């Protein structure tokens, strides 16, 4: 089922770059809608004093975000971190690294996914689209008017509030909520 969902999203997003001008007075130009591409990687462009970068650094993901990509990173605004507890509030604690990594990789999508791509995938999916994350779980994308909203595994809703910030290895989408994956399953205790 997950493979079908991933394939469907890939097809939906892949078809988003086709231009249909039948009901438009101007051509569809996603490149104009996106902010100018920077020559910095995602990691280099993030605020080093920001909560997401600090958490990514603690989890060892800053080197991944400096890698070739492409990635789409859903970066929660700093004030969103005040709403969560657990591994993210105590990101520097080495005991929380595995959980922190699991949560942060839930904020990374493979490939470059623009807001327009998500919106079209939602439209093509009759109101919603499942989006695969790097940790193997999915987010559900919907729309609230013109804004794209992502719902996590526990029901939290994050709106993309500032996005399509292109970098040399992908794109950054800023969201207003920290997204939480489904609880990790624990291996049964050995007797």
Q: Where do the model's predicted regions map?
A:
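Mature, structured domains of secreted/extracytosolic soluble proteins
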Residues: 2-5, 16-191
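C-terminal motif of bacterial Sec signal peptides marking the signal peptidase cleavage site
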Residues: 11-15
């Amino acid at each position: 089922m997950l493979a079908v969902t991933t394939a469907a999203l890939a097809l939906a997003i892949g078809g988003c770059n086709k231009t249909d001008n039948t009901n438009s007075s101007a051509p569809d130009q996603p490149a104009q809608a996106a902010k100018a591409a920077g020559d910095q990687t995602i990691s280099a462009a993030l605020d080093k004093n920001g909560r997401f970068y600090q958490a990514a650094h603690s989890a060892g993901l800053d080197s991944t975000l400096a890698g070739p990509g492409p990635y789409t990173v859903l970066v929660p605004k700093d004030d969103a971190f005040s709403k969560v507890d657990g591994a993210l509030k105590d990101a520097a604690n080495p005991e929380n690294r595995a959980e922190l990594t699991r949560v942060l990789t839930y904020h990374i999508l493979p490939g470059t996914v623009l807001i327009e791509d998500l919106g079209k995938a939602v439209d093509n999916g009759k109101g919603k689209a499942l989006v695969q994350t790097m940790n193997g779980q999915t987010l559900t994308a919907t729309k609230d008017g013109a804004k794209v909203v992502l719902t996590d595994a526990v029901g939290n809703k994050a709106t993309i509030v500032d996005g399509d910030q292109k970098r040399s290895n992908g794109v950054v989408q800023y969201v207003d909520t920290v997204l939480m994956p489904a609880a990790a399953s624990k291996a049964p205790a050995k007797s």
